[in-house]
């Protein structure tokens, strides 16, 4: 891929009108109605509680049995099973926050698509959720965009363990994992060829349609979970490897603490969130030995990150941050429909970035978006990834979104 050095004055950005108004929230959850006390659904329950406390009109939608209906005047509501009145939704004042489990059934995702088609902002979109739930697809997309990931190959069939190991080009031990799965479930530590073949054959016997991945093992004492909302980093926590295990998931008993990110780690995590189209995601990585200089190993991106352990480690209330950020309606449409061609390029100040080729009017301009823009005395200050650039203001056009 061709790398282009872009100097500061070449930045083009959209200026969004900041607009804070009263808004409404619908929370989509796969939680069974009877499991209110379960830690598995902690975040959806806390979202509902805090929204009510803040005076936000909120509705917890249980995906099983729910549907979207439209009356003769075009008004839309989404009721839970047994709730005839339901919850009124509109793209003008409603956002949908999607929690884990929606990828269990196609009909759940189809309901999300119906909601998206009404113009309602969804956190996250169906596209983002489907990318993140497919670990191999995520790995390919991250690597194609220039991020560093563990070497990963598909295990083609029940007799394909040895072939996959050869393609991996690694030594034992290796990691065998299912292509879907969260919280460290479906991840196995393999120390020999015999062990690999046995595990692969057993898993295929249990499910002939299973998709398995073989991944190089990166020895580490911890990994890091970074919370990203609206392309901004909220905080990061270190998850120490469980004693006697190789996993570092909080749900598996890992000890946790706050983690201070290096500049390159911050940049890579924001890029990972953008690549999967995530409004609110958790980015997991293993730091490089020289984390100030080298890229981290991005492990995966979670489209429904938990908040309990993160708040315990960082003292940051992610749910409160989320509701505050989306109070500003200009943040509702941070994921426009993709068009044109995407490219990775190096900016003189901001470093490696992802730009979108503007295909309108036969243009060959690469467009990037700044986090903040300040215009003063015919100068403009661009803020992106924690860095700032000042340049002369040549021309500005305000574009109202949403």
Which residues make up each language-model segment?
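Glycine-rich phosphate/pyrophosphate-binding beta-alpha loops
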Residues: 302-312
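Pepsin/retropepsin-fold aspartyl endopeptidases
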Residues: 333-402
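ATP-binding N-terminal substructure of ATP-dependent carboxylate-amine bond-forming enzymes
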Residues: 2-121
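Phosphate-binding site of ATP-dependent enzymes
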Residues: 185-272
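A long amphipathic alpha-helix within ATP-dependent nucleotide-binding catalytic cores
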Residues: 246-298, 322-327
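Active-site nucleotide/adenylate-binding loops and adjacent lid/helix of ATP-dependent enzymes
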Residues: 22-33, 37-44, 48, 90-91, ...
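Protein kinase-like catalytic core scaffold
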Residues: 174, 235, 281, 297-300
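Short, surface-exposed charged micro-motifs
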Residues: 225, 284-286, 356
């Amino acid at each position: 891929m061709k790398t282009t050095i872009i100097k500061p004055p070449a930045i083009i950005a959209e200026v969004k009108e900041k607009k804070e108004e009263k808004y409404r929230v619908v929370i989509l959850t796969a939680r069974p109605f009877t499991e209110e006390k379960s830690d598995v659904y902690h975040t959806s329950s806390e979202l509902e509680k805090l929204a009510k406390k803040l005076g936000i009109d909120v509705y917890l939608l249980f995906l099983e049995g729910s549907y979207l209906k439209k009356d003769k005047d075009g008004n839309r509501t989404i009721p839970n099973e047994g709730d005839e009145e339901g919850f009124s939704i509109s793209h003008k004042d409603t956002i949908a926050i999607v929690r884990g489990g929606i990828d269990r059934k196609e009909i759940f995702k189809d309901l999300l698509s119906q909601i998206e088609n009404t113009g309602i902002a969804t956190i996250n979109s169906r596209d983002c959720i489907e990318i993140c739930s497919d670990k191999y697809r995520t790995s390919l997309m991250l690597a194609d965009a220039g991020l560093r990931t563990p070497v990963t190959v598909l295990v083609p069939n029940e007799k394909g363990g040895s072939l996959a190991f050869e393609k991996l080009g690694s030594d034992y031990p290796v990691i065998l994992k299912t292509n879907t799965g969260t919280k460290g479930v479906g991840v196995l530590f393999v120390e020999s060829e015999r062990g690999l073949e046995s595990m692969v054959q057993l898993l295929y016997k249990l499910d002939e349609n299973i998709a398995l991945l073989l991944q190089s093992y990166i020895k580490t004492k911890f990994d890091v979970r970074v919370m990203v909302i609206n392309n901004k980093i909220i905080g990061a926590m270190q998850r120490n490897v469980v004693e006697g295990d190789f996993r570092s998931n909080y749900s598996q008993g890992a000890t946790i603490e706050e983690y201070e990110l290096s500049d390159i780690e911050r940049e890579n995590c924001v890029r990972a969130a953008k690549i999967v189209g995530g409004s609110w995601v958790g980015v997991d990585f293993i730091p490089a030995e020289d984390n100030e200089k080298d890229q981290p190993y991005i492990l995966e991106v979670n489209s429904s990150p938990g908040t309990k352990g993160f708040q315990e480690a960082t003292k940051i209330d992610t749910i409160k941050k989320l509701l505050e950020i989306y109070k500003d309606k200009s943040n509702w449409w941070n994921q426009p429909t993709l068009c044109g061609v995407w490219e990775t390029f190096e900016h003189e100040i901001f470093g490696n970035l992802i730009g979108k080729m503007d295909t309108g009017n036969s243009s060959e301009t690469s467009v990037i978006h700044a986090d903040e823009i300040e215009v003063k005395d015919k100068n403009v200050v661009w803020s992106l990834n924690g860095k700032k650039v000042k340049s002369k203001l040549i021309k500005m056009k305000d574009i109202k979104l949403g």
